[in-house]
């Protein structure tokens, strides 16, 4: 990273940590932090999720603290929300479960992309609030007005902070390389989905900015949906990069109508 990129990245990271602490305190003051944990457990049990240790209701991505000034950031990948493995005390990192393994192996198998998933990628989410399954966020929102407010507020913050970080990194690069954004998982970005606030805010923030052309939308890595979709929509007459770009733009236009 350039010196200015590093400065801006650190500012983003510090604000992220501050927001996690702020949201945590907000629930503590309202005396519903334990209620959130109970709801997270209950919704997982109701969905038949095998028992797992519930450690952290809000998850900051500790992988961000592993980034050093000499790292070459080439991509920002945005998932949905932290799952079972991501929230464990020994992890507190995004995309470390099966989906993360699939993503990591995809880049390892395709060195022509020039991306090390654990070294060249900043991984974020649409909200830092944990659930075993993304759809369970809707249950939390129905059970508590404050949780609903917090889930929406966190989406808006993530959209703003991510768009700003992306644009800042591009504007302060050495001009040699582009930095892309991959939105992986778009089911809840459609219709009356959970992440409509995120979608609409993100589109508004990129309005008139050239960085929008490097935002791509894909199926989620989970259950190999990303790989299956890419395989079905790839041409043998195009490079992998060309196929990825074409597919990512197609999904972006379908979701954002732009």
Model-derived features: where do they sit?
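Flexible, glycine- and charge-enriched loops at secondary-structure boundaries
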Residues: 92-100, 148-155
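A structural signal for short, well-ordered beta-strand segments and their strand-loop junctions
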Residues: 77, 115-116, 120-125, 180-185, ...
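Short, surface-exposed acidic-centric catalytic microdomains
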Residues: 102-142
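Residue-level preference for short coil/turn positions at secondary-structure junctions
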Residues: 70-71, 117, 177, 211
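Conserved alpha-helical elements of sugar-nucleotide-dependent glycosyltransferases
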Residues: 95-106, 198
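Short secondary-structure capping micro-motifs at structural edges
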Residues: 61-64, 90-91, 104-113, 165-166
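Active-site and ligand/interface coordination hotspots across diverse enzymes
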Residues: 1-98, 174, 235, 242, ...
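Glycine/proline-rich loop-helix segments at beta-alpha junctions forming the active-site rim
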Residues: 3-4, 8, 131-258
């Amino acid at each position: 990273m350039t010196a200015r990129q590093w400065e801006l990245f650190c500012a983003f990271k510090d604000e992220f940590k501050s927001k996690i602490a702020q949201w945590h305190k907000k629930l503590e003051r309202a005396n519903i932090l334990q209620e959130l944990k109970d709801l997270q457990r209950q919704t997982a049990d109701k969905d038949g999720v095998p028992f797992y240790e519930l450690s952290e209701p809000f998850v900051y991505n500790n992988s961000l603290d592993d980034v050093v000034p000499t790292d070459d950031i080439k991509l920002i990948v945005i998932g949905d929300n932290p799952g079972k493995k991501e929230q464990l005390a020994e992890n507190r990192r995004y995309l470390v479960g099966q989906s993360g393994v699939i993503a990591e192996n995809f880049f390892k198998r395709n060195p022509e992309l020039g991306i090390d998933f654990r070294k060249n990628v900043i991984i974020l989410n649409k909200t830092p609030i944990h659930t075993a399954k993304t759809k369970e966020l809707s249950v939390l929102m129905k059970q508590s007005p404050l949780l609903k407010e917090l889930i929406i507020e966190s989406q808006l913050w993530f959209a703003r902070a991510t768009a700003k970080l992306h644009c800042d990194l591009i504007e302060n690069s050495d001009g040699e390389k582009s930095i892309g954004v991959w939105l992986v998982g778009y089911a809840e970005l459609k219709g009356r989905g959970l992440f409509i606030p995120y979608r609409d805010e993100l589109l508004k923030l990129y309005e008139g900015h050239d960085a929008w052309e490097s935002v791509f939308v894909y199926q989620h890595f989970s259950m190999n949906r990303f790989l299956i979709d890419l395989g079905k929509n790839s041409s043998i007459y195009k490079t992998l990069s060309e196929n990825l770009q074409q597919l990512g733009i197609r999904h972006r236009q379908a979701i954002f109508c732009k």
